[in-house]
């Protein structure tokens, strides 16, 4: 793993940039066009190697009552397998080339603020087709999910009572957006239409 970066502190914020490169050995993957029928995993797995690299940037800036955060990452994760020399280096299942995030906040009072945030990500690599069947050798690691994005809104209230602290957070995830299907199945137990999810928390530190 190799990584290097640069950080700069400004009067009312900071910015930073970093680059990295990683190598991976003995990567496991299911062979293309394979149905798992028993516990003999050795029959279904192939072994290879991989690497990943990327560049990440972050900006935070305040202007009076406003604050802005922006982040962007370009990253690639690749794998190659001796059993598939014709495919060369293919994207890994964790390959998400572009990730963009941002949040804009406005301080309503000395204790409260309102925020709008969002993110945009490339689609994940598919390992099953539209009929949930294994992909063929020709289609192996060639297809992606659609672009993933969402916009959230939130309100926070923070009040100190001597050495005690009260923190209230309210908001809505995915006011508009399109999420990964597994994100919806894994994390959304209560939601409105369009996978819109309300949230709230009340914390008291003493």
Regions of interest found by a model, annotated:
Residues 2, 55, 153:
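Residue-level detector of short, conserved catalytic/binding motifs and their immediate flanks
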Residues 14-16, 27-29, 33, 67-69, ...:
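Short acidic, gly/pro-rich beta-turn/loop elements at beta-sheet edges
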Residues 19-23, 41-130:
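Gram-negative outer-membrane beta-barrel transporters
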Residues 91-206:
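Conserved C-terminal beta-signal and adjacent last beta-strands/turns
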Residues 31-41, 75-85, 130-137, 179-184:
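Flexible, solvent-exposed coil segments and beta strand-coil junctions
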């Amino acid at each position: 793993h190799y990584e290097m970066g640069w950080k700069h502190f400004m009067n009312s914020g900071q910015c930073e940039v970093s680059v990295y490169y990683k190598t991976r050995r003995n990567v496991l993957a299911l062979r293309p066009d394979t149905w798992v029928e028993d516990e003999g995993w050795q029959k279904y797995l192939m072994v290879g190697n991989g690497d990943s690299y990327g560049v990440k940037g972050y900006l935070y800036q305040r202007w009076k009552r406003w604050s802005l955060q922006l982040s962007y990452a370009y990253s690639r994760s690749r794998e190659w397998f001796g059993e598939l020399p014709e495919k060369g280096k293919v994207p890994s299942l964790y390959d998400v080339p572009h990730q963009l995030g941002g949040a804009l906040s406005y301080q309503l009072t000395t204790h409260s603020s309102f925020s709008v945030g969002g993110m945009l990500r490339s689609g994940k690599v598919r390992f099953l087709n539209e009929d949930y069947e294994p992909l063929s050798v020709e289609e192996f690691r060639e297809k992606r999910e659609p672009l993933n994005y969402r916009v959230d809104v939130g309100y926070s209230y923070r009040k100190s009572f001597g050495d005690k602290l009260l923190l209230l957070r309210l908001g809505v995830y995915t006011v508009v957006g399109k999420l990964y299907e597994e994100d919806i199945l894994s994390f959304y137990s209560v939601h409105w239409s369009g996978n819109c999810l309300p949230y709230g928390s009340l914390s008291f530190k003493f």
